[in-house]
Amino acid sequence: MNVHEIKSIEAKSILSRLRSKDNYFGIAYNMNLYRGCQHGCIYCDTRSCCYGIGNISQISVKKNALELLDHELETKRGKATIGTGSMNDPYMPLEKQLRLTRGALELIAKHHFPVHVITKSDLVARDADLLQDIGQTYAAVSFTITTTDDELAHKLEPNAPTSSERFKAMKILSDRGIYTGVTLMPVLPFINDSIEDIEEIVEKAAEAGASYVLPMFGVTLRRGSREYFYEKIEKIFPKMTKRYKTYFEDRYECISPNAHYLNEFFYNKIETLGISANMKFYHSEGKKQLSLF
């Protein structure tokens, strides 16, 4: 991406409180340092019209993000987990030069807040030192991995590091004692929803030291993201759009017809590998990590 394609904007705030309790990722605040994302994942929900983002390939940098974050963390009455990676990837290629995410982690460490990073990038391993420091309070890194097939991953997530590179970064973090795992989502119906697909991801996650794997055996599509997904998937898998439209119509949640079997296999597999299907969360009382179940 050329420098002239990047906008600089001034934000009014940097942390947004979730309206309801997050029992899946354990996040209380969302933090987005950038607007838009360079990874170009064809299934990205951020393209949905309801968010009002527009062209997500147009990247905007929040120039006052770190100043705002420092102030907001200073004035919070209690500590709760900050999540980053929901609307864009905090480790998109631009981060390598701008180091905005690293700057945010330095402030999170300074104020002793817990953090949960969700990413598709191996660049997160660069910040292992800070994540170790934050881990004294609570730090989790979840790698989104949809397939172990690097060629397929490149088609679905064209500008993101390969799945192999993500697993290598996961191993680096887990070897340093950082709590890490996999967000196995989305699982695209008729594309990467076989038992073999799930087995390969879970086994590689175990080899890389994952403590958990969080699955979703389907994909969410709504106005804005659906049209883009169909346009791109048709070029990769001709006639796949017709299959989706026939099977799912205009449903928001497009769950794999194999979901029941995948779910049963998944839970049996992770049990044999000693991996959990839910995360341990930060808890302010005594700063303990609590599991959902």
Which ranges hold each PLM region?
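Conserved Radical SAM active-site core
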Residues: M1-S142, T146-H154, S163, F167-K168
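Surface-exposed amphipathic alpha-helices with a cationic face
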Residues: Q132-G135, F167-D175, Y267, E271
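Auxiliary Fe-S-binding modules of radical SAM enzymes
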Residues: M1-E10, S16-R19, I195-F293
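A structural motif
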Residues: H112-F113, I178, A210
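Conserved strand-turn element in the central/C-terminal portion of the radical SAM core barrel
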Residues: T148-D150, E157-N159, I172-S194, F217-T220
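Short beta-strand segments at enzyme active-site cores
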Residues: I82-G83, I118, T180-L184, V213-F217
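Short histidine/acidic/glycine/proline-rich micro-motifs that form metal-
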Residues: D89-Y91, V187-F190, Y252-E253
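Active-site glycine- and acidic-residue-rich loops that bind
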Residues: D122-A125, P189-E199
